Curated annotation (Swiss-Prot):
Keywords from the named record: Cell cycle, Cytoplasm, Cytoskeleton, DNA damage, DNA repair, Nucleus
Region (Disordered): 1-53
Matches recorded under InterPro entries: BCP1_family (IPR025602)
Cellular component, GO, one term: cytoplasm
Protein name according to UniProt: Protein BCCIP homolog
Amino acid sequence: MASNAKRRALEPERLLEKHKEDEEDMEGDESEESDDIEEDESEEDEEVNEEVNIDFEAYTISDADYDGIKKLLKQLFLKAHVNISELTDLLIQQNHIGSAIKQAEGQDDSDDDEDDDHVFGVISLVNLTERKGTACVEQIKELILSRCEENCEQSLVEQFDKVLNDNSKPVGFLLSERFINVPAQIALPMHQQLQKELADSQRTNKPCGKCHYYLILSKTFMEATKTSKGSVGSQAKEELMFANAEDEFFYEKALVKFNYSVQEESDTQLGGRWSFSDVPMKPLRTAMLVPAERMNSIMDKFKEYLSV
């Protein structure tokens, strides 16, 4: 069980689990054996709409969360050359910041003890400037710069390169990942708590304190018929769909940003072969650099979004 040193109750969220109804009964006369099979299948495949109340709590990241965090990072990086095992270890080592989101204790919706420590989401930050030279950190920077070179004009590449390699203005890689069935409401208290922890770290001279910029890598989608290459403007923004709703507010406040396709890497369900309203969607990643001073206004926008 994860450490209870930093348990924070989050608002209970109502999740709707739907089990799809299979096929309708076949018309026409069937043999007696076929009728019996059809009756059995009809009973088994009857549509069930079940509402499940789940209370989430935020816990201090611990060794027990290793597999769960690694799985969440895998859905972000897919097949990119980033050592997510090392990155996961780093998040665990610096657990004075960040949270693992799990089901609240005392709920018995599952009979499987193995699910007791299931990680539904994680939020943390890696200070790329402080961790300069660490393999996974250098790989993250190389990933962003190489994809930028492949998809953007040289001026944008130079902007990203300058910010990522300016030791006088630290850059924090902001990680906020969760599974798709976890509602967006959970993200606001997670981000607010992280900002408090970062402020405390700066005040006490602990790692990951002051950041001038946040680097965010967001899971986004676009209609398969649209182009995603290059830097993105207002028209492209309207065509983007965000896996994490709050990422749109970071996008709006970003200093620079660009998209790149991960369609060739998304060969698993975690990668997200999505469709909306029967329209095939192309999976992307959107890289953003957001000035830290804009975080308060981003959180305000997110509050407005949740209040509607």
